[in-house]
Each structure stands twice: as C-alpha cells, then as structure tokens.
C-alpha cells in the first residue's frame, strides 16, 4: 500500500461558491504548517488565510484537520475550503505541490485508501460512486443504504453461516469417532438449506438494487405486425423504429435508452418471431431470442384483433415455454382503439396484462407506471441496497457452489467435497466485500471514481 501524501480538488471543477482541496497522508500536517502557519485543532473548523511561500494570501477560508486513524481515509487529512473559482483552487493545489513528497491523487484514491485502511469495505466504497452518479431519488437512497453497510451486513452474515457450517463439516471429518453419521443426521442438511434460502433472498434484493442502479432491460417480443416497433416509439417518445403494415419490417435489434422519473430503462425492439425461409430475417429472429435470454422483463406484444385470449399460455404456448424459467412476462394487448377493450390491468397465470394502443397512445402511461414499479420506483427501501453487475455474478457463483455442495451431500454423502464447495462459496461471497479481491479488479473499480473521492 502506498504511503504517499496525496492532494486533489474534492469539489467539481469549474465555478462555484465553495471549492475544497483535500490532502491525505503523513505530510498533511506539513501542508497545514506551510499554508496556514500551524496545524488546526482536530475536528474544529478554523477560519484563516491560505498563504503562498512568500507569505502572501492566496485565499481565505475554512481549514479542517482530521487526525488519523479517525478520518475518512484512516490517515491524517487536511481540507482547505476556499472560494470556488477554478484559478484560486489551482493556485492552492500548486502551492501544496511545492511541498516535497506530495503528489496529485489518482481517481478514487482517497476512497481506495479508506478501503485499504479498513475504514469501509468494497461495497461501501462502490456506493460512494453510486451515490454521486445516482440519476433518481430511489438510486440515491439505495446507494446510501449500501454506504451505511446494509449490503455488507447481508453478505457478512452469509459468510459467517457458510464458514461455521464448513468448520463443522471439516471437524466432523477429522474426528469421525465423535460424529459417526454426521452427513445423514439432518443437521448439516438443515443448515445448508437455510443458507441457500438466505442467499436466494439476498440475490433477489441485489437484483432489484442492480436494476435501480443500472436500469432494467425490457425486450418487446411477439409475432410480426403485433405493434412492437410502435410500442418502442411510444415509450421512447420519438420515431426510433420504422413502422409499416408489412410483416417482418424489423429485422434487427433496435435499442432505446430512456429514463422514467430518473430511473434508467433499456428498451429492446426485436424482429417478429415466426418460421421463415428468409435468411436475413432468420438472423434477426436468432438475435431476438438472444436478447430475450438476457432480459430482465419481456413485454409479450399481442395483436388484440387476432385473439381474445389473455392467458399467455393460451395465446402462444410455444413462445412461453421457450422463455427462461425466471423471466417475468407482461402481456401487452395492442390495438385497444380497434377492439374497444377497457384499459384496465388484470393478472393471468402470474403475468400482468395491459391493454394499450401503441398507435394512439392509449394505456401507455399506465404501462410506464408498471415498468417503474418493476424497477422499484417509490417502493419501501427499508433494508434495500444498490448492487452492481459484479455483485450479481458473485452471488450467482456462490449459489452454484451451494447447489453443488447440496448434491455432494444428498447424492454422494461426500463430506470432503461438500467442504470444498463451501470454501468456494466463501471465496465468491468475499469477492463482494473485497476481502478476497484481485488488484486488477480494485484498480478497475477505483479508477472509475472522480478525482478527489
């Protein structure tokens, strides 16, 4: 770990009422002595002059000193809060850099130092960037929950449970005389099932947190001429897709990225699904299924003039049967302006059914509200947190190892292999909080931060 003293502007570049220069490291006290003549009293705001090497005043403002380890980074930290003109702030940084042993901080280096000094874990460090980058009130609240340790707490509880079970299994293997039938007495199985159930709950919360942060991927799918491209245009509020009465007009994937009350939504329009001999259209249909496989939600577009059915399994059973098992489906019955259907929401076989007219805009607002609710808009956030794609991947890896461990227990009664799967589960979960994390991943995470954070 570096022992350099670092400096950076902590406020956004440009003109503002207040600008903050942050210094962290062993030489922070030297900076204070050089610029304001003394080291301020710890955790007290002091109004003073900021001087250059000749004793001339560069600016006037507030100096704050935090003695390590009781600071954000865990090191000595000095903050100089002056006027927010960029020239003034540049002059202050230049003055600080005149002191030997100080360099400009890399992006995210203050947060990285805090992580290295155990002031916060990796999910909390990531939450700082997520809070800054939040595009909605929901995202900001969720990021704050993660910053306060909600996500970390859930992961630590899982790690503790897995560790305890692993230690029990390994101890029973090492001392078989004391626990002859330990693999078949039900105790290990019950503990393992509880861990799997707990992980399922955390995965569901993390999935929701990822949608709040990164947006929900919604794929519009259905037969040709059902109105899929018209719906894309209606949701996007512009003519993104060509709309004609010719079946198979859309042959490739079309994407629109929009925000609903600040929450990101990624809408994918796909080629109409049917049997065809047209090579180009076949490629488009293959791409449509590839998009469906990675979707968070499918809008199953139905031409309401062709069927009265509302149950998705009755409308097109082959399509529904081919969808991923956990993929949610919203049935969208289009052309309500022609069928005269009431624009109400119903539930059929676990799927929401909406009636709209993509052409006239009838029911589009209600469908948008539905999509916002799926993203967690204005939902109860107590215990909620923000999550990233890497978190979901780590949780999925942990879940896979637990399932393999369950198989080793139930089918083979293989204690050693169960213990190994529990160890791999520990490793996967510990990647989330940064207990076991590669330097390359740390560099990628902190390198995406703002300079000064």
Swiss-Prot record:
Top EC class for this record: hydrolase
The EC number(s) this enzyme carries: 3.6.-.-
Entry keywords, A to Z: Cytoplasm, GTP-binding, Hydrolase, Magnesium, Metal-binding, Nucleotide-binding, Potassium, tRNA processing
UniProt: Mg(2+) binding residues: 229, 250
Coiled coil: none
Binding site residues for (6S)-5-formyl-5,6,7,8-tetrahydrofolate: 22, 79, 119, 453
Entry's Gene Ontology BP terms: tRNA methylation; tRNA wobble uridine modification
A GO MF term: GTP binding
Positions contributing to GTP binding: 225-230, 244-250, 269-272, 334-337
Keyword 4Fe-4S: no
PROSITE patterns from the UniProt entry: G_TRME
Keyword tRNA processing: yes
Compartment(s) of residence: Cytoplasm
CDD domains linked: trmE (cd04164), TrmE_N (cd14858)
Cofactors (names): K(+)
Binding site for K(+): 225, 244, 246, 249
Xref: HAMAP family: GTPase_MnmE
Cross-referenced NCBIfam families: mnmE_trmE_thdF (TIGR00450), PRK05291.1-3 (NF003661), small_GTP (TIGR00231)
Assembly with partners or alone: Homodimer. Heterotetramer of two MnmE and two MnmG subunits.
The protein, known as: tRNA modification GTPase MnmE
């Amino acid at each position: 770990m570096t022992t350099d003293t670092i400096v950076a502007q902590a406020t956004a570049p440009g003109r503002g009422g207040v600008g903050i220069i942050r210094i962290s490291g062993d030489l922070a006290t030297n900076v204070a002595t050089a610029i304001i003549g003394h080291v301020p009293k710890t955790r007290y705001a002091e109004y003073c002059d900021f001087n250059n090497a000749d004793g001339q005043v560069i600016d006037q403002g507030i100096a704050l000193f935090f003695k390590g380890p009781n600071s954000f980074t865990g090191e000595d930290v000095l903050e100089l809060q002056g006027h927010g003109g960029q020239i003034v702030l540049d002059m202050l940084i230049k003055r600080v850099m005149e002191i030997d042993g100080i360099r400009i901080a890399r992006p995210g280096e203050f947060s990285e130092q805090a992580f290295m000094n155990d002031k916060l874990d990796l999910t909390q460090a990531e939450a700082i960037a997520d809070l800054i980058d939040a595009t909605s009130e929901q995202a900001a609240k969720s990021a704050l929950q993660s910053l306060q340790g909600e996500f970390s707490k859930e992961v630590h509880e899982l790690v503790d449970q897995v560790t305890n079970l692993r230690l029990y299994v390994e101890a029973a293997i090492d001392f078989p005389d004391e626990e002859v039938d330990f693999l078949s007495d039900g105790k290990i199985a019950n503990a393992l099932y509880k861990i799997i159930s707990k992980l399922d709950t955390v995965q569901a919360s993390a999935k929701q947190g990822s949608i709040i942060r990164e947006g929900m991927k919604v794929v519009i799918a259905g037969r040709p001429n059902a109105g899929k491209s018209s719906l894309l245009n209606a949701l996007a509020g512009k003519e993104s897709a060509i709309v004609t009465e010719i079946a198979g007009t859309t042959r490739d994937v079309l994407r629109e990225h929009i925000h609903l009350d600040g929450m990101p939504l990624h809408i994918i329009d796909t080629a109409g699904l049917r049997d065809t001999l047209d090579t180009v259209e076949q490629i488009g249909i293959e791409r449509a299924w590839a998009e469906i496989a990675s979707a968070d939600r499918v809008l199953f577009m139905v031409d309401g003039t062709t069927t009265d059915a509302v149950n998705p399994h009755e409308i097109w059973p082959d399509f529904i049967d081919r969808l991923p098992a956990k993929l949610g489906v919203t049935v969208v019955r289009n052309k309500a302006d022609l069928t005269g259907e009431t624009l109400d929401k119903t539930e059929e076989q676990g799927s929401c059914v909406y009636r709209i007219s993509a052409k006239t805009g009838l029911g589009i607002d209600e469908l948008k509200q539905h999509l916002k609710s799926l993203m967690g808009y204005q939902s109860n956030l107590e215990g909620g947190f923000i999550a990233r794609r890497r978190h979901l991947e780590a949780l999925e890896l942990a879940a896979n190892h637990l399932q393999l461990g369950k198989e080793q227990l139930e089918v083979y009664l293989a204690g050693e292999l169960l213990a190994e799967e529990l160890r791999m589960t520990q490793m996967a979960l510990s990647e989330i909080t940064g207990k076991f994390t590669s330097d390359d991943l740390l560099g990628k995470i902190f390198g995406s931060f703002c300079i000064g954070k």
